[in-house]
Amino acid sequence: MNGKAPELSVVIPCFNEAANLAPLMARLVPVLEGLGRSFEILLVDDGSRDRTLEVAAGLAAADPRIGILALSRNFGKEIAITAGIDHARGNAAILMDADLQHPPEKIIELAAAWDEGFQIIHATQAVRPSEGMVKRLCVKSFYKLLAQLSDIKLPRGAGDFCLLDRAALDALKSMPERARFMKGLYFWVGFRQKQIPYEPAERTAGASAWNMRRLFGLALNGLTAFSTVPLRLASIAGILVSFIAIIYALILVTDVLLHGIDVPGYASLMVGLLFLSGVQLISLGILGEYVGRIFNETKQRPLYFVGNYRPAEGHADAGSLSCASQASPEAASATRT
């Protein structure tokens, strides 16, 4: 590269992936070399607790085309991806996981689609036989719900394995929000997009950090990031409950005045109170999610802090402490120097 921007940057967020990095590089580097393009590989350590950073440092020492971006703590995968995008110097960036579930060989097709003029190319995964029925049902329901409640139409199997050209990268870097749902942002920015299917492999080592609780949190973040329909649903629910209560009250008054029927007390009262209380609590919870997002946005904290940045070919000071805030693209740019 000789100081010039590489054609491709491969951004790999890592969290406790020490056992997977060497096998990944053994497959990834030959694929990139076979493309005949200049490239850099950026390993983004998201506060790993194992030897991930140590292994990454050894790989970078052996191959100057490998760079390291170590965050000061664990900020989560969405922020780690954002940090990698901020520091990617290539004309296009390929995002992929470190666990080898994203086959490096698929990069050949992603690069070919980029040559055809597409600016965002998604590798969409097929359903894995090892996935449980409950997880498949939850994922399918989320994609359908997001499509119904927002203008973001995520295809089934779309993830973080994708190629983004420089225009898309700059668009993503300009976005200020803190609670980020990157899969939705890839589609929201627009540009010419294409999908390429692939068969995901099993993890070669270690266990996934994603459980149902974290997946639910990501889904909730995605819904609140791209839709205000839940707020409208809470209002509609309140109107319906009020309407039902008025109808029920009219029925009771009619029974008493016209038919002399005694109004049953505690059963109907308790059912009404419990139902109304449930609707109120759900509405407050939905409102709280949006208020919490507003609170986090108004704090204007940096998205992340960088504890150690050593770019490919060593063009920056290692060990420097820096930060980046999506509210200020200039601050994000400062971390790349």
Where are these regions (language model features)?
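Short conserved micro-motifs on helix faces and helix-strand junctions that flank
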Residues: 13, 71-73, 162, 235, ...
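Structured catalytic core of nucleotide-sugar glycosyltransferases
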Residues: 1-132
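Conserved amphipathic alpha-helical interaction elements at protein-protein interfaces in regulatory
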Residues: 30, 34, 58, 62, ...
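Acceptor/aglycone-binding surface of glycosyltransferases and processive sugar-polymer synthases
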Residues: 67-73, 77-87, 92, 104-185, ...
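Short, conserved catalytic or interaction motifs in soluble domains
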Residues: 46, 73, 98-100, 151, ...
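Hydrophobic helical membrane-anchoring modules
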Residues: 1-4, 181-337
